[in-house]
UniProtKB/Swiss-Prot annotation:
PROSITE patterns: PHOSPHOKETOLASE_1, PHOSPHOKETOLASE_2. Its EC number is 4.1.2.-. It comes from the Bacteria. NCBIfam families: PRK05261.1-1 (NF003616), PRK05261.1-2 (NF003617), PRK05261.1-4 (NF003619), PRK05261.1-6 (NF003621). Pfam families: XFP, XFP_C, XFP_N. This is Probable phosphoketolase. Belongs to the XFP family. It comes from Mesorhizobium japonicum (strain LMG 29417 / CECT 9101 / MAFF 303099).
Length: 807
């Protein structure tokens, strides 16, 4: 435990008064942190500490906390001196009690939670609630004012920070990166975000690498490598590292104040040069960063039971445990708490003394009250173009072909154009914007890029609003940071590789879910995914690129958070895009193809269909509104195509068969209404799918997903699903469907298998379909492409009337 009694300025940047007040603030934050971890009662130690004052289960992380509060205190000083606009991202989010402590000292916590007042009773509640049933979580969760990053799963702090800084020219995002977190892949990639930050337009990110030396039970790499290697590493990333190292509080305060002043001066100079034309034209600045080396568990017990604790991994969580069994630990805890001299920090009522309160900035300059950290306060609706202005015109279903995502790209181009002044919309992706056919956006913007631009480069520019880096983690982190600070965006990615961010998706979904229970958290714009180059269009890249399972990851989350859309054509894709860009506090997953494909619905019909999310396609059905013999359902663009091709075969071969075609755009409509707000009631579901007729369901993804969504439905036993069965290779597009049994011929066979009255035609027609499958196999192995009747198929023509191609 450190002795704070000899704090003196000793000729540094800080005066004696400044140093005293800064250190008092830090001591108060540390005291409040320990109190949250340990205490149920006696918050100010106004009586001897007894076992009944201590929580029965000790939860929390002390090791990182004093460093987090040390940084927080010094950032407060910088904000006050410069009237700066700063938010704090806590990479080591397990230091949650430190973040709560600082927001309490700033007064924000009590303003938002009036029952936890700044007095002794409020402090008692503050301590009791931490990591306690009915209380608050242990990390920097949404209930912590000023937090936009929980930091439970490590690796995303820096990408969140840069996302927050984009298009926020007056904002400085201080991002504390723990040295454990710095070992993760996502964090390593995120250091390159400085190649995309434009000081003329964007805010600044100040990374603060906190080297306290240890993870849970191991040393950290960056804390052990030589300093010249560490300096070279970050210089290679394009940063100017500024170092602060030590353990003695007075000296560390002076060093940190000096270095932080230097960092803010450099940030101001970079911005001024970029915005006044005095910087090197088009050059990327060398942004400052701070490397803070301080002991893990700083100011805590130096030893416990004769074993080193401060400055070692033993301080990571709870340095003193087993208090009921070891009275010496209880005594040591009391001494530790008293070492901060709480009687100097809190007045008779239990409130922080005036000098500590004055150390914090005021109003929205407080990091815990900055509106950028509650982005819903700043969110403004996007200006959106008219749907009909971008619609694919068609006289009848299947009359024309279009590239669905290219049509979406023209819509997004106009979203960019209409919101150019607001600068609140961006597209991110891992070098797949053009590949996914969204290239029309480059008519109005470029790819953001702060490195050298060569004469032969295309669509690169300093002002570009499309951000591309081949790290899905960084893309997701940028977009989350952008959304969390009140803006809008879209993540475009290959379907198979979006799995790289499965866990980030989970964390964001949990954040949104928790925010719903916090009244002061205002809704933010939804996280929107476009997944293209999907499983049925990856025949050229092969098995590694074929995976529709992200839908299943999404469906694991709470119903009120997640939406999954499978538009069958361009006009329905436009309707879905228009809708998701107007939603908030959701995660919307859109799966759509990019090759030229048949278009089915006019814009007016697409609007009606998408509004319902599901519906009967009367023009493809043969039941004439009567009870059908079979329901042929489809979800996804390729399943829809194959279903309609199968319907066409059946209409010719079994003309009296009553077929009802049901198309699903909004996958969540299949769930019962009591499980999802978009779900159909049982009566509505039965009206579409019947209570007892066979349903042949062609689905984009894994078949069991449909069974999972419909298992409570009346007719579930009659639902027979065809989808992706993990069969793939490099082959032809149609062969991908054949390998997985999703093709038209297998679908026809399913109808024959499950419609009882077709027994008379079953054998001959099934054999005909088997012959077609054999013919298909022989043809592709001979010619390397699909049969002409597949390539030239059209809705409404005789299946045998497709034009023949020469061999």
């Amino acid at each position: 435990m450190n002795d704070h009694t000899t704090i003196a300025a000793s000729g540094g940047r800080l005066s004696d008064r400044e140093l005293h007040d800064l250190d008092a603030y830090w001591r108060a934050a540390n005291y409040l942190t320990i109190g949250q971890i340990y205490l149920l009662d006696n918050p100010l130690l106004r009586e001897p500490l007894r076992l009944e004052h201590v929580k029965p289960r000790l939860l929390g992380h002390w090791g990182t906390s004093p460093g987090l509060s040390f940084i927080y205190a010094h950032l407060n000083r910088a904000i006050r001196l410069r009237d700066a606009n700063v938010i704090y991202i806590c990479g080591p989010g397990h230091g949650g009690p430190a973040m709560v402590a600082n927001t309490y000292l700033e007064g924000t916590y009590s303003e938002l939670n009036p029952d936890i007042a700044m007095d002794e009773q409020g402090m008692r509640k503050l301590f009791r609630q931490f990591s306690f049933p009915g209380g608050i979580p242990s990390h920097a969760a949404p209930d912590v004012p000023g937090s936009i990053h929980e930091g439970g799963e490590l690796g995303y702090s820096l990408s969140h920070a840069y996302g927050a800084a984009f298009d926020n020219p007056d904002l400085v995002v201080a991002c504390v990166v723990g040295d454990g977190e710095a070992e993760t892949g996502p964090l390593a990639a995120a250091w390159h975000s400085n190649k995309f930050l434009n000081p003329a337009r964007d805010g600044a990110v100040l990374p603060i690498l906190h080297l306290n030396g240890y993870k849970i039970a191991n040393p950290t790499i960056l804390a052990r490598i030589p300093e010249d290697e560490l300096r070279a590493l970050f210089a290679g990333y394009g940063y100017e590292p500024l170092f602060v190292a030590g353990h003695e509080p007075a000296l560390m305060h002076q060093r940190m104040a000096t270095v932080l002043d230097d960092a803010f001066d450099r940030i101001s100079a970079i911005k001024h040069a970029a915005r006044n034309g005095s910087g090197a034209t088009g050059s990327r600045p060398e942004w400052p960063m701070i490397v803070l080396r301080s002991p893990k568990g700083w100011t805590g017990p130096k030893e416990v039971d004769g074993l080193k604790t401060e400055g070692f991994w033993r301080s990571h969580q709870v340095p003193l445990s087993g208090l009921a069994e070891n009275p010496a630990h209880l005594k040591l805890l009391e001494e530790w708490l008293k070492s901060y001299r709480p009687e100097e920090l809190f007045d008779a009522a239990g409130a922080p003394v005036a000098s500590i309160r004055a150390t914090a900035p005021q109003a929205t300059k407080r990091m815990s009250a900055n509106p950028h950290a509650n982005g819903g306060l700043l969110r403004r609706s996007l200006e959106l173009p008219g749907l009909h202005d971008h619609a694919v015109s068609l006289e009848r279903p299947g009359a024309v072909k279009a590239e669905s995502t290219r049509v979406m790209g023209s819509f997004l181009r106009d979203v960019m154009r209409l919101n150019e002044v607001a600068k609140n919309f961006r597209i991110v992706g891992p070098d797949e914007t053009a590949s996914n056919r969204l290239q029309d956006v480059f008519e109005v913007t470029e790819r953001g890029w702060m490195e050298k631009i060569l004469p032969e480069d295309v669509h690169l520019g300093r002002e570009g609003r499309v951000l591309e880096i081949l790290s899905e983690h960084t893309c997701q982190g940028w977009l989350e940071g952008y959304l969390l600070t009140g803006r809008h965006g879209l993540f475009s990615c290959y379907e198979a590789f979006i799995h790289i961010v499965d866990s980030m998706f989970n964390q964001h979904a949990k954040w949104l879910d928790a925010c719903r229970e916090i009244p002061w958290r205002r809704p933010i714009a939804s996280l929107n995914y476009l997944l293209s180059s999907h499983v049925w269009h990856q025949e050229h890249n092969g098995f590694s690129h074929q995976d529709p399972g992200f839908i299943d990851v999404a469906l694991n989350k709470k119903a009120d958070i997640v939406r999954v859309y499978l538009p069958p054509d361009a006009n329905t894709l436009l309707c879905v895009t228009d809708h998701v860009l107007q939603t908030w506090n959701r995660i919307n997953v859109i799966v759509a193809g990019k090759p030229p494909s048949w278009q089915w619905l006019s814009m007016d019909k697409a609007i009606v269909h998408c509004r319902a999310g599901i519906g009967v396609w009367d023009w493809a059905s043969t039941d004439d509104g009567a009870e059908p013999d079979v329901v042929m359902a489809c979800a996804g663009d390729v399943p829809t195509l194959e279903t309609l091709a199968a319907v066409q075969i059946l209409r010719q071969q079994v003309p009296d068969l009553r077929i009802r075609v049901v198309n699903v755009v909004d996958l969540m409509t299949l769930q019962p209404k009591e499980y999802h707000p978009h779900g159909l009631s049982d009566r509505e579901f039965d009206a579409l799918f019947t209570p007892d007729k066979p349903v042949i369901f062609a689905y984009h993804g894994y078949p069991w997903t449909i069974h999972r969504l419909t298992y409570r439905r009346t007719n579930h036993d009659n639902i027979h699903v065809r989808g992706y069965n993990e069969e793939g290779t490099t082959t032809t597009p149609f062969d991908m469907t054949v390998l997985n049994g999703l093709d038209r011929f297998h679908i026809v066979q399913s109808v024959l298998d499950w419609v009882p009255r077709l027994k008379g035609v079953r054998v001959s027609l099934k054999q005909a379909m088997d012959s077609k499958l054999l013919e298909h196999r022989a043809y592709i192995c001979s010619h390397g492409q699909d049969m002409p009747e597949i390539l030239d198929w059209k809705w409404g023509q005789d299946p045998d009337a497709a034009p023949k191609r020469p061999d």
